[in-house]
């Protein structure tokens, strides 16, 4: 995505983080599921900015569908008016994202409590 858009700063960060470059595939969650590796499928919350041009929404939609197809529980929330890293900037959508996390955690705790009872 960074190369396609000519985002030199993101390309530099990717080159630094994924060194050697082929390591980008080793730990890529989508590719792990595509390879049908054995993994623990914990409940997952994905929050995506609808205007994010770093990790585009379609990538998260595909991953959520793949995760569900592999037997995992995945809640995907797309915040239509948000870009990348919007949760760190005070706004109504950031507040909603924080509430979404709280609700997701509360749901997981209720599920664990029911199993323990």
Region locations from a protein language model:
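Catalytic active-site module of serine/aspartate enzymes centered on a nucleophile-bearing elbow/loop
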Residues: 92-117
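Hydrophobic anchor at the start of a short beta-strand
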Residues: 21, 44, 73-74
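Mobile cap/lid helix-loop segments that gate and shape the active-site cleft of serine hydrolases
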Residues: 1-35
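Short beta-strand/loop motif that positions the catalytic acidic residue
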Residues: 39-40, 45-48, 52
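Catalytic histidine neighborhood in serine/cysteine hydrolases
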Residues: 68-85
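Conserved serine/cysteine hydrolase catalytic core
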Residues: 30-41, 58-59
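Conserved alpha/beta-hydrolase "acid-adjacent" motif
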Residues: 53-62
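Catalytic histidine-centered segment of alpha/beta-hydrolase-like enzymes
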Residues: 82-95
């Amino acid at each position: 995505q960074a190369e396609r858009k000519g985002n030199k700063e993101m390309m530099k960060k990717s080159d630094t983080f994924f060194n050697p470059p082929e390591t980008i595939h080793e730990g890529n969650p989508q590719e792990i599921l595509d390879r049908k590796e054995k993994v623990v499928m914990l409940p997952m919350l994905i929050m995506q900015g609808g205007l994010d041009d770093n990790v585009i929404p379609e990538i998260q939609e595909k991953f959520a569908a793949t995760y569900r197809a592999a037997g995992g529980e995945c809640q995907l929330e797309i915040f239509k008016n948000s870009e990348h890293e919007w949760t760190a900037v005070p706004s109504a959508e950031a507040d909603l994202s924080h509430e979404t996390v709280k609700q997701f955690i509360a749901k997981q705790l209720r599920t664990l409590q029911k199993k323990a009872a």
